[in-house]
Amino acid sequence: MGIEYKLNKDGEVFKWLLDSLGELKTNSRPYYRSGELTRIITTDEHGHIVVEYKDKQQRVVLKKVQAEANPAEYGHTGWASTYYIYDQYSNLRYVIPPQAVEHILEGNITAFESQGGILLTSDTTL
């Protein structure tokens, strides 16, 4: 049980971008550079882990909840990952839920629609 504070590593967290109209750029997903985010690792009394990545404005950009017994230390394997995307005024614009993150990582989503800031595929709600 406890809390650890670390920094992110290169290639660990997607840095989602918005275009000039505030729409999510789905064709470009660079990563945050090493040390750009604070990585807060919380372990509960049962040994379950939650990892939050916060930017310099203290906004949570990624929250990973342990989904398997032995999740990978870095990346998304074994985690239920949720991304939070903010506009230039720090307003939360999009939430990418765990199932959508899985489909994105598998390459199964090439286009998005959104409804109320939640990402949808063109034919299925994720």
Specify the residue positions occupied by each region the protein language model found.
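Beta-strand elements of repeat-based all-beta scaffolds
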Residues: 1-126
